[in-house]
């Protein structure tokens, strides 16, 4: 089992640090085949969150939990994530930006906790 938390990072630092953590655990746990999928989905998801934030003071806490054959990544924001939830929930090539559709296709499961401004993203890894 692997657990790591990035605490309250500004948004741009969150992207860099997230990719570093993903690279490290993929290397450590021999998940190189999953690196591209996870890193692309998380990079695009974090960019989507940044682009849809209400102010320049966006901070994110990101918790990584690798257990058995699943990687769960919890993203907690200091701002509401309400504006990206509908886009991700209804992702399709017809009604969304192509990047949103790609994010949704790469992630195995995504859930929202609007009350706590959290997203839980899950990837099945082998």
Give the residues covered by each predicted segment.
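Flexible, glycine-/charge-rich segments associated with ATP-binding catalytic modules
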Residues: 1-13, 92, 97-126
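Intrinsically disordered, low-complexity acidic/polar segments
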Residues: 15, 82-84, 119
